[in-house]
Amino acid sequence: MKEPEISVGIVNAQEIHFSLNGNFFAKGETVCGEQQVAFSEGGILWNGNLYRELTFTPQDEHASFSLYDVTIGINFHWERQETQSFMGTLKLVVDEGKITAINILPAEDYLISVISSEMNATSSLEFLKAHAVVSRSWLFAQIEKRKALSDKNEGFFSFIKTDTEYIRWYDREDHTIFDVCADDHCQRYQGITKASSAAVTEAVRATRGQLLMYERGICDARFSKCCGGASEEFGYCWEDKNYPYLSTIRDAEEEENRPLPDLTKEEEAERWIRTSPVSFCDTHDKKVISQILNNYDQELQISIVGKYVIPKQNYPN
């Protein structure tokens, strides 16, 4: 099977300032250096001309591009703007009165950046391998879901309405012009800006093409780097359906010896929240935290470590 290319939405703004670090091909000419585009009269204004979309294709494998003022950590405590650099193709399209910058690149190259953006590139090799498989599975599960909805000419919409309640699920399927976004809403993807390592590249290459499967389908492998000591049912978080491999479990070693209390009971839930139950996340080992978390994830002084919510017993053989 040929490695697929994926499209990642990076930034959406009225004006976008970027730099082509090498030779790129666009609108019949070779261009490089500093560039500026602006939304104008329903199109993209670049070098005095209006376009519906623009594609900048690298002329060699070493060419990259940098986008300025990219917001990361949207609505998180560490939200900030960065200059980020990327390999691959840069595509600019008009979307709802703004310009969206999209990076198109091979899936495995995308994963190398995801691992270094979500977690720290200094993490252990086996940890990085597990992350590569989980992130790859999540990515392809979303692409398959998006394709299925497109084939049926359906959009993502999931809600329950009763006389007293209106419950709406908001997932990442609201992306219609690219496969995934670059922030925590999907998976963090910060291009080649984040320091990578030989171990990250080895982890992705060693697991190339490996996916988590369940009943001949790709697992929708949701994951988190912090928790409250227990995982939640998929259907209460993402969509009105449940998967056996994304069920509620105790997030701790020797799970079978540490039964999870019934957190649907108010008194049990309050006790759980107000105390510090034994869990993978409950660590104060600064060495471990600094090894696996990027700097901005350590700015809020709480105990968090990486832990995936896929139950081990449901991993495919």
In which residue ranges do the predicted regions lie?
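Conserved, single-site charged/polar hotspot
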Residues: 1-317
